[in-house]
Amino acid sequence: MRALRFRDVILGVLLVGASAAAPACKKSQPAAPPASMLTPDTPQGFGPRLVWLAFRGASPEAVARGLQLNEPASSTWADGLKAAYQGRVFVTPPLGDAGWVLAASTRFPDPGDKKHPDAATPALVHLSQLFGEVQYFATYDVLDLHAWARFVKGAPVRKLAYLGADSTYVWADGDPTPEENKLGLVFAGKPVGDKGPNEENVFAVAGAWSIDPSTLQTRNLPPSLGVVGSPP
């Protein structure tokens, strides 16, 4: 039996302007209730075993359009995050003073590995052209995969991704940002013993660049609704 790969878990299906692998059969989703019938709930923390994107100042509806989601509909946090872990996409309402909107899923593109191409970079280039800036975060403990990236106006500013299962940095591009330096998260781009980025580091960088989704339940944010949809 071959070893489990990151690509087997987080599928690169959001390829904008690039050819995608043959899609799995899609199950039809039950019709979502209208927003007027939903009761907003309190934001919940998330992050482990997910990929999420961060957009500053965009509306959830604009992000859903940019991600080309199928059948986007209003969703509670509880249902939206459940859907994200089942392969759909949950887009949060604006969070914090800066109005960060996060989009979470297990089916966003991955940075690739020795056997698979980088599916994330083309999508992030396109999304940063649409929105001005997009941030990418991924953490999956089973494979010791931890990644963060920032793209601005179509260009990568910083990309770091470590696949501990292979002791490999699949991304190590751009200089560490001031936030990474302040956190002491400066990695050489090659393994030093078993020292590489971990899940805690991903959340720390997310909190410094935008917002740490694992802390949302502690922020006293008001009840709200997001948007859920299926990836293209």
Features from the language model and the residues they span:
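Bacterial signal peptide processing site
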Residues: 26-28
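Short, extreme N-terminal segment that most often corresponds to the first beta-strand
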Residues: 33-68, 229-231
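Short, intrinsically disordered low-complexity segments
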Residues: 72-161
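A general structural signal for short secondary-structure junctions and capping/turn motifs
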Residues: 2, 42-45, 127, 140
